[in-house]
């Protein structure tokens, strides 16, 4: 696999950007195209093979309004605290799953790949957006019963949330 971090990606579904693309793995050990890798916040995150471990750490690497993108690799991401999206002009996205993925990337049984984020907090929010021009896309958010998926403050002008699904209680809902 090549180390493409600009102008899209080898999967041709990641947003094209003039900024950097940071990759975040769902677990400490993860597999891409049949190869195993270890995620760590000591990695630079600039390639799927060198993915970061946490979303919050990836946000810290981004530059405001430079077109930086954070890609959450397919799988079940879990957070223990609210993620403060406090860098303007970034995109946080999962791998789009609107169409069946090629066999090299798809799960067994013909299911579509999906990037999920679950919180382990007793109450709270998964993402709190406090800056302008943030895009959040292609994620399945599973907040706890007393929480919510995304909170956008008054300063979160032009926030763009699309192609996300939310589990609310025992029922999934869709925002498009």
Language model feature labels by segment:
Residues 55-64, 77-87, 102-105, 123-129, ...:
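Short, T/G/N/S-enriched strand-turn elements that build extracellular solenoid repeat scaffolds
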Residues 22-27, 53-78, 91-97:
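Glycine-rich repeat segments that build the extracellular carbohydrate-interaction surface of secreted
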Residues 12, 26, 53, 67, ...:
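Membrane-topology and secretion signals of cell-surface/extracellular proteins
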Residues 166-176:
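Solenoidal tandem-repeat scaffolds enriched in leucines and small polar residues
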Residues 88-148, 169-171:
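Right-handed parallel beta-helix/beta-spiral solenoid domain characteristic of secreted/periplasmic
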Residues 1-20, 63, 107-116, 140, ...:
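Extended, low-complexity segments enriched in Ser/Thr/Gly and acidic residues that occur primarily
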Residues 1-57, 76:
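Right-handed parallel beta-helix/beta-solenoid
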Residues 21, 67-69, 76, 82-84, ...:
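Detector for repetitive beta-architecture
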């Amino acid at each position: 696999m090549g180390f493409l971090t600009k102008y899209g990606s080898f999967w041709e579904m990641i947003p094209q950007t003039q900024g950097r693309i940071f990759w975040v793995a769902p677990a400490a050990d993860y597999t891409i195209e049949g190869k195993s890798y270890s995620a760590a916040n000591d990695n630079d995150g600039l390639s799927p093979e060198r993915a970061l471990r946490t979303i919050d750490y990836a946000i810290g690497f981004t530059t405001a309004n430079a077109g930086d993108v954070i890609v959450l690799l397919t799988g079940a991401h879990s957070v223990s605290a609210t993620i403060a999206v406090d860098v303007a002009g970034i995109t946080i996205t999962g791998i789009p799953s609107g169409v069946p993925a090629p066999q090299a990337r798809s799960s067994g049984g013909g299911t579509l790949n999906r990037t999920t984020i679950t919180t382990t907090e007793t109450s709270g929010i998964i993402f709190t957006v406090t800056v302008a021009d943030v895009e959040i896309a292609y994620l399945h958010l599973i907040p706890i019963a007393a929480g919510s998926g995304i909170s956008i403050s008054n300063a979160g002008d032009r926030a763009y949330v699309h192609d996300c699904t939310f589990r609310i209680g025992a029922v999934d809902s869709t925002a498009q």
